[in-house]
C-alpha cells in the first residue's frame, strides 16, 4: 500500500525567515509521519502581466533610491544576496511542486494541508492577493485540512464573511495558530477549530541542530538583532548594550533605516539566519515569541521586546 500523497498550500514566494522556516518545519513533520508531501508553488498566482508591470516599476524606484541615497546601496546589495540565499534554501531543503495547472493536482495528491502563517489574512494589504480559491484549496473536492492557519487580525471584515464561510465549508479539520483565530473561524463556520502550535515548534532541537550544523568555532562575540518593527527605543537599547559589553552588533538587513546602525548588516537566507542566532552571545528580537521559540534557544541568551 502506497503512502498517502499530500500537498501543502502555504506561502513560499515571500522571502521571510519565519514564513520559509514554518514551511520547512511542517513539511519535515509530515514526512516524519510517513506521508509523501510537496508544497504547491504559489509564486505565479499573481497574473503574469501584472507581475511584470510591478517588477518594472519596483526596479525603477530602486534605482532612483540608489542614486539619491548612498546608504540604500548597502541595503539593496544585501537584499539581492539574501534573495539568492532564500532561493538556495528553498531549492535544497523544500520539496516543491512547480506545476501551475491546478487541474492536474488531484491526479497527484490525495489530501491537501493549508497553512500555516497568515495564509488567510483579510487585511487590505493582503486580501487582493490572498482572495483566491488557491489559498483555500478551493480547486478540489478532495479531503482538506488546515494546520495553524493564521488570520493576522482580531476581527474578520463583515464584507468578506460569506465568501470565507464558503471557502471553509468542506474542510474536514480546522486549526489555527492563535486563540483569537480559533474563535473567529469557529464563529464564522460553526465548526470546531483546534488551537495548535506554530510548525517550528513541531520539530525538536535535534532536528534544527542537524540542519544548522555544528556550533561555530569562531571566537568572535556579537550581539544579534532581528527587528520586524521600526522602533528607535529597541535600536538605542541594543546599541547601548553592545557598547557596554564591548560586543560587535550584527543586524539583519530587513529594515532599510538600520543600514548604518550596525557594525555589520547581515545578508541571510533561512539557514544563515539560524546559524547567526546559533553563534550570537545574545539575540534581541521583537518577533512573536512562539514563532521562533524552538529556534532562538540556540542563542546563548535571548531578549524579547
Language-model features: locations:
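Aromatic- and Gly/Pro-rich donor/ligand-binding loops
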Residues: 6-17, 21-166
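Hydrophobic alpha-helical packing residues
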Residues: 23, 30-31, 185, 274-279
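Short internal beta-strands
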Residues: 39-41, 146-148, 172-179, 249-253, ...
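Short beta-strand scaffold positions
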Residues: 114, 176, 284-286, 304
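Catalytic donor nucleotide-activated moiety binding site of glycosyltransferases and closely related
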Residues: 143-153, 185, 227-229, 233-269
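Donor nucleotide-activated moiety binding/catalytic core segment of transferases
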Residues: 193-201, 205, 254-291
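Catalytic binding pocket for nucleotide-activated donors in carbohydrate/polymer assembly enzymes
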Residues: 295-305
Amino acid at each position: 500500500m502506497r503512502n498517502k500523497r499530500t500537498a501543502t498550500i502555504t506561502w513560499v514566494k515571500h522571502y521571510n525567515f519565519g514564513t520559509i522556516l514554518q514551511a520547512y518545519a511542517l513539511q519535515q513533520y509530515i514526512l516524519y509521519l510517513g506521508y509523501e508531501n510537496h508544497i504547491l508553488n504559489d509564486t505565479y498566482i499573481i497574473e503574469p502581466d501584472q507581475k511584470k508591470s510591478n517588477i518594472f516599476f519596483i526596479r525603477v524606484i530602486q534605482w532612483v533610491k540608489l542614486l539619491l541615497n548612498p546608504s540604500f546601496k548597502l541595503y539593496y546589495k544585501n537584499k539581492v544576496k539574501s534573495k539568492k540565499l532564500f532561493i538556495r534554501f528553498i531549492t535544497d531543503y523544500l520539496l516543491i511542486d512547480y506545476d501551475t495547472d491546478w487541474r492536474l493536482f488531484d491526479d497527484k495528491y490525495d489530501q491537501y494541508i493549508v497553512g500555516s502563517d497568515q495564509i488567510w489574512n483579510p487585511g487590505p494589504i493582503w486580501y487582493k492577493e490572498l482572495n483566491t480559491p488557491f489559498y483555500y484549496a478551493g480547486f478540489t473536492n478532495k479531503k482538506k485540512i488546515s494546520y495553524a492557519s493564521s488570520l493576522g487580525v482580531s476581527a474578520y471584515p463583515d464584507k468578506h464573511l460569506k465568501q470565507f464561510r464558503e471557502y471553509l465549508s468542506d474542510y474536514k479539520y480546522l486549526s489555527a495558530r492563535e486563540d483569537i483565530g480559533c474563535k473567529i473561524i469557529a464563529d464564522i463556520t460553526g465548526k470546531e477549530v483546534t488551537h495548535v502550535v506554530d510548525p517550528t515548534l513541531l520539530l525538536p532541537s535535534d532536528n534544527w541542530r542537524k540542519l544548522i550544523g555544528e556550533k561555530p568555532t569562531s571566537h568572535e562575540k556579537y550581539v544579534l538583532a532581528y527587528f520586524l518593527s521600526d522602533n528607535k527605543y529597541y535600536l538605542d537599547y541594543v546599541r547601548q548594550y553592545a557598547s557596554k559589553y564591548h560586543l560587535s552588533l550584527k543586524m539583519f538587513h530587513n529594515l532599510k533605516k538600520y543600514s548604518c546602525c550596525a557594525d555589520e548588516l547581515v545578508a541571510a537566507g533561512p539557514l544563515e539566519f539560524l546559524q547567526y542566532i546559533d553563534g550570537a552571545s545574545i539575540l534581541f528580537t521583537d518577533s512573536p515569541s512562539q514563532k521562533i521559540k524552538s529556534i532562538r534557544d540556540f542563542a546563548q541568551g535571548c531578549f524579547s521586546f
